Structures are given as structure tokens and as C-alpha cells.
UniProtKB/Swiss-Prot annotation:
SUPFAM superfamilies: P-loop containing nucleoside triphosphate hydrolases
Catalytic activity reported: a ribonucleoside 5'-triphosphate + H2O = a ribonucleoside 5'-diphosphate + phosphate + H(+)
Protein name per its UniProtKB record: Nucleoside triphosphatase I
Cellular localisation: Virion
Chain segments carrying region Binding to the cap-specific mRNA (nucleoside-2'-O-)-methyltransferase: 457-524
Similarity annotation: Belongs to the helicase family. NPH I subfamily.
Domain of life: Viruses
The protein's Enzyme Commission number: 3.6.1.15
Pfam hit, one: SNF2-rel_dom
GO molecular function: ATP binding; DNA binding; ribonucleoside triphosphate phosphatase activity
Residue ranges annotated as motif DEXH box: 141-144
Enzyme class: hydrolase
Organism whose genome encodes this protein: Myxoma virus (strain Lausanne) (MYXV)
GO terms under cellular component: virion component
Length: 632
């Protein structure tokens, strides 16, 4: 049925044939061809009420959206633009971009922050003041966050944001409004987010039944058939975050490293106490105590049993101040720092004080110590991701930076008033090599809405619960032309996953979280494929045999067809001959997977999903006594 969608895309392009690709305000910008294409389709089809911009970080989805907003009055006279964004993104990029390229629409814009506790009240207060003769254009930036806040909790209680979600899904198409959702990672935590996003864009088209059976999408073709033109898909990096990616003239090369560091005996003892405390408290599934213990340990485990929050807070402050005092009384010699910068260990020519200080730092945190040494040895600027701010997180990490004489900025929840300016200083041309500011340490606050330039090394100190968050974090440093000022031999980004290990070989919390991320990503990859094949770009390129249309009268009926989640066509199992093998997408064997290769060369993963056909004379390497096929 995508051939019919192609006819309407063609119609939109004919209607907007003379639309300029230049946007001028106080400054002028010329849109890239893919930005102009999206804009023409969305503006050329007045009845296209909604569109997802599934664009990877750095390709300019904000500029694309501002261009569309600037040209809304080409379609209709009276518009009010409602931008639903995170508070941190109101000023930059949104107000900044609109003021720069479309200042005339600023008076028609209403910013409402969906991370405000009174968000739903502010939204409906504004809605009541808008004339019924006025059309709305609603922008939802980082829409995965909005969707996440709209999901009903496990206790069945509806979250306030859900009332806004319900209003939009009911009224956008009904009252001839327009909706644009933006995200580089539209699915983050669960498949339910996909269902909710689809039903926001195409109301009631998808029911809440399971889309998967044994981790395989039940009816991919039906979804692709009915969801045609639901999104614009600009994603050049479709690799897993764990895969190496070759560079290009516009993008830096990415290489992934797993840095396994062994906990010290002291750290292991505290880690085991943390594990026991989680079991007693019934919070072992969150792994919070173990995550903190694997990162940093004080001289003793902070047991919260039978203590008031105030007592716990006071004890934490005391432990922190004791460690801070210890750091301030110590200092590495210039000789030691010079060795660290050359990537060398302390040896026979090193002083006893330097060796003792390094051992004491490592005893409390194998991860922080390892990262500091790698930062000093890096030839350029570095990013360090640490999700925890207080306790054993950024608070302590900055003391380690002080000990190793590492210059830094901090982008976290506690630096809201200064962090935007700090990033601007960090990104300055004169700091391309990190001579002025070596490192930016950031929490989850740094995952969205910001860009970093000329980064050479990223250190992931603690895992998030999903690949999407990590992808966004990495994507902030590998963007279109992000390394244009960097010397050619340094146009690369090394991504280091810092993984703590136990001496007895038991899996640590770091290794557990890696497994969780990989399991989730299998289902998400299949849903992202649906978005790709239903995108306006894919349809326009692949569906060329269509009969042109002269109006858009049939568009609404085309996109309103409900999806049959119980198809009559079922998969018929076939028995094939072959063998179990190991395979990897990386020549460096970063991640090795178990699969099945048929006698005719087809490769399937452990869940039965087809991967690719293995060519004659494949590359095979030996890894941990296994023969591993290296895929092209």
C-alpha cells in the first residue's frame, strides 16, 4: 500500500515546487536537501496532521522544524505554535534558533515545559485562551521523554502528562491541527512506548496487544503497510553502540573499547556488603547500592538500616569531608603527571609518595583511577559520563580530577545556571586540543540538547538501563562536522566502557546491565526497521510505480486504516540443516554473538532473526577458543 503513500508525497512536492530552501532572519541558512524534502512534504499535504522526525543527533531537526513553522502561513493564516520541550532546551536551541532565523513567528509561540510539575495545568490554561478559528501547530521535542511521562504507572494511577497526551491524540486530527514529534531515540525503555507514539501520531490505529512472539515482530509487513509516511527517517548510523563505525568526510570514526578493571580487595568487600543490603531492603532489582560501590567506596559501607534520612545524610557528609581532606593533603609530583600523560606506569624512578597516593586512590575506586589515567594520556578533549551526582558520583569524581590536576567543566542538574556557558567555553576553537579545559563530566542532563566538538575520548563510568540513552550520549560527540577543526589524524572518537570486575569471576552489576541493554535492543531494532520502511524518504525512493493524484482528498482515509494484529498469515516453521556458530559485527570482536548458519550460508541470530548471507571465503578469527565469523 506504500505505493499510494508515494502518490501523495509526489503531490506534496509538486504543490511546493517553488518553495525556497533559504531561511533568513538576523542570519541566513540554506537547508540541506533532506531538510527541504521533509518540509515540503509536511507543508504540501495540509491533511498530514502529524509527523515524527526520527533524525539522529547532529543533522538539524531543530532547523528543519523552525523552517516549517516559518512557512505555516503559506498554508493557513492564523496559527498558534505550542512548543512542548524540556526546560533546559527552551533557550538553546529553540528560542535561539527561532530568534536567529524566524523572529517574526516568536510572537505566535507558546513554550510549555513538560518536566514542570504543573505542566498539564499550564497546557490546558493556554488551550482555553486560543480562538477556535486558530489552528495549532504542536511541537514535542525529545518526544520519547513526553511519552515516558505519559505512561500509566504500574499501580494503575494516571500520570498528569497523560491528560495532555489524550487531548492531543483526540484533537489534532479532529480540528485540523498539526503535530511534529522530534527524537533521535523514539523508543527508549519499552515496546509500549512505540504503541503510544504511533497512537499519538495516528490515533487508535494500534491496540495494546503484544507485538512480539519469542522476541520476533509478529506482523512486520502489516505495520509497514498501514503506517506509511508516519515519519521522516534520517539515521546514517544504524549500528549498535557497541560496534565500530568507519569515519567519513563529515563524521568522526568511532572505536569501542571495553576497559575491564579489577576491584581492589577493599572495594570488593564493600561491594558484597552493598549486595547484602539490597537483598535485605528488597531493592536488589534496582542494583543501586552495588552500582555505587562498584564506582567508589568510602572507608566503610554506609549502612542505612535503622537510621533516619538526616542521620544518613550527616554520615555521608562526614565521609565525604574526610576524603576531601585526604585529597587536599596529597599531590602528585610533576614527574608522575608527566609519566601519566605519556601513558606510562609509575616505576623505579617514581617517588614512594606518588606510588602510595596512586594506590590509595585505586583502593577506593578502580574505575575513577583508570579513567583519570586515560584522560591524561588522551591527546585531545574528553567526555566522562557519570549518572550519579552526589554520594559516590560526580561529587567524588571531581576530587579525583583535582588529585590528577585535570581541568574540567560540569554539566549536571546542580549546574543549571552555568552549564550552557561552560559548554560554550569548552567548545571554543582555542580549546580544540583541550589545552584550556580538558574534560566535561556530565550526568543524564547532558544526554540531550547539547553538542560537543573535537572530542577524542568518551568514558562511560556507569551504564544506563537502555541502549538509546547511551546512543544519545555518544551521539552528542559524533555529529555532522563535529571534528572539522580537529587535525585530520585526530578525527576519531574512542568510546570506553569502564567495567568493574570481581576477582572470583562472578558477574558484576556493570556486566548485568550490559546484558539487559543488549536484550532490549533486539526488539527495538525491529521496530526501528518499521520506522525506516514507513518513512517518507524510503517510500519516495522505493515506490516509484504509482498513479499521480491531483488533490489530497483520499489521504485521511489512507492513514486511518486500523492495523490487524491477528493476521491470518502465520509463520510456517521449516527445518533447515546447518551448524551453530559464533559471529561478530566488529573486526576487533568487541561483541561476540551465538548464531546459526544454514548450509546455504544464511545466518540467523539466537532468536531466529535473519542477519545476512555469509559470503564465500569469510573472515574467521579465534577468540577465547572459539571460531568467530566476522561479518561484513
Amino acid at each position: 500500500m506504500s505505493v499510494y503513500h508515494a502518490a501523495y508525497i509526489d503531490y506534496a512536492l509538486r504543490v511546493t515546487e517553488n518553495m525556497t530552501d533559504v531561511m533568513t532572519g538576523s542570519e541566513t541558512v540554506t537547508l540541506k536537501s533532506y531538510q527541504h524534502f521533509v518540509s515540503r512534504v509536511f507543508l504540501g499535504l495540509d491533511k498530514m496532521h502529524s509527523l515524527l522526525l526520527f533524525h539522529e543527533t547532529g543533522v538539524g531537526k531543530t532547523i528543519t522544524t523552525v523552517f516549517i513553522l516559518k512557512h505555516l502561513k503559506d498554508v493557513y493564516t492564523n496559527w498558534i505554535i505550542i512548543l512542548l520541550v524540556k526546560k533546559a532546551l527552551v533557550e538553546d536551541p529553540w528560542t535561539y534558533a527561532i530568534t536567529k532565523y524566524a523572529p517574526e513567528i516568536l510572537k505566535d509561540c507558546i513554550f510549555i515545559t513538560y518536566d514542570d510539575k504543573n505542566f498539564h495545568n499550564k497546557f490546558f490554561t493556554n488551550i482555553k485562551t486560543i480562538s477556535s478559528r486558530t489552528r495549532l501547530c504542536i511541537i514535542i521535542d525529545e518526544c520519547h521523554n513526553f511519552i515516558s511521562k505519559s505512561i500509566i504507572k504500574e499501580d494503575g494511577k494516571q500520570r498528569p502528562t497523560k491528560s495532555v497526551y489524550n487531548y492531543l491524540s483526540k484533537n489534532v486530527a479532529l480540528h485540523h491541527h498539526k503535530l511534529i514529534c522530534l527524537s533521535a531515540t523514539p523508543i527508549v525503555n519499552s515496546v509500549k512506548e512505540f504503541v503510544m507514539l504511533v497512537n499519538l501520531l495516528r490515533p487508535k490505529i494500534l491496540s495494546n496487544v503484544s507485538l512480539f512472539e519469542n522476541k520476533r515482530l509478529v506482523n512486520e509487513s502489516e505495520l509497514i503497510n498501514k503506517l506509511g509516511a508516519i515519519c521522516s527517517y534520517i539515521v546514517t548510523n544504524e549500528f549498535s553502540i557497541f560496534d565500530d563505525v568507519a569515519g567519513s568526510s563529515a563524521f568522526a570514526r568511532k572505536t569501542v573499547y571495553f576497559q575491564y578493571v579489577n576491584m581492589t580487595q577493599k572495594q570488593e568487600q564493600v561491594y558484597q556488603k552493598a549486595k547484602l543490603a539490597e537483598l535485605k531492603a528488597g531493592i536488589s532489582s534496582f542494583r543501586i547500592y552495588r552500582r555505587m560501590a562498584a564506582t567508589f567506596t568510602f572507608d566503610a559501607f554506609l549502612d542505612k538500616t535503622d537510621k533516619t534520612p538526616e542521620e544518613v545524610a550527616n554520615e555521608q557528609i562526614t565521609l565525604y569531608k574526610d576524603f576531601e581532606t585526604f585529597i587536599k593533603t596529597k599531590k602528585f609530583s610533576e614527574h608522575a603527571l608527566s609519566q601519566f600523560k605519556r601513558g606510562q606506569s609509575l616505576g623505579g624512578t617514581s617517588s614512594a609518595d606518588d606510588i602510595s597516593f596512586l594506590n590509595e586512590l585505586r583502593e577506593r575506586s578502580c574505575k575513577f583511577t583508570d579513567v583519570c589515567l586515560r584522560i591524561l594520556a588522551s591527546p585531545g578533549k574528553c567526555l566522562v559520563f557519570e549518572p550519579f551526582v552526589n554520594q559516590s558520583g560526580i561529587n567524588i569524581l571531581l576530587l579525583y580530577f583535582s588529585a590528577f590536576n585535570i581541568s574540567y567543566i560540569e554539566f549536571s542538574s546542580r549546574t543549571k545556571n552555568t552549564r550552557v556557558q561552560s559548554v560554550a567555553e569548552f567548545n571554543k576553537r582555542e580549546n580544540t586540543d583541550g589545552d584550556l579545559i580538558k574534560t566535561c563530566v556530565f550526568s543524564l542532563s547532558g544526554g540531550e540538547g547539547i553538542s560537543f566538538f573535537s572530542i577524542n575520548d568518551i568514558f562511560i563510568l556507569d551504564m544506563t538501563w537502555n541502549e538509546a540513552s547511551l546512543r544519545q550520549i555518544i551521539g552528542r560527540a559524533i555529529r555532522l562536522n563535529s571534528h572539522v577543526l580537529t587535525p585530520e589524524h585526530r578525527r576519531y572518537v574512542n568510546v570506553h566502557f569502564i567495567v568493574a570486575r570481581l576477582s572470583n569471576g562472578d558477574a558484576t552489576v556493570d556486566e548485568d546491565l550490559l546484558d539487559i541493554i543488549r536484550t532490549k535492543s533486539k526488539e527495538f531494532t525491529q521496530l526501528f526497521k518499521v520506522f525506516k520502511h514507513t518513512s517518507i524518504e524510503w517510500i519516495y525512493e522505493h515506490q516509484t510505480d504509482f498513479s499521480p493524484v491531483d488533490n489530497e482528498s483520499g489521504w485521511s482515509a489512507l492513514i486511518s486504516r486500523s492495523i490487524d494484529e491477528n493476521p491470518t498469515t502465520k509463520r510456517v516453521p521449516h527445518v533447515v540443516k546447518g551448524q551453530n556458530i559464533w559471529y561478530s559485527h566488529s573486526n576487533r570482536l568487541i561483541a561476540v554473538y551465538k548464531g546459526f548458519k544454514t548450509d546455504d550460508g544464511r545466518l540467523f541470530d539466537s532468536d531466529g532473526n535473519f542477519i545476512q548471507t555469509i559470503q564465500d571465503n569469510p573472515v574467521i578469527k579465534i577468540h577465547n577458543d572459539k571460531l568467530v565469523y566476522v561479518l561484513d
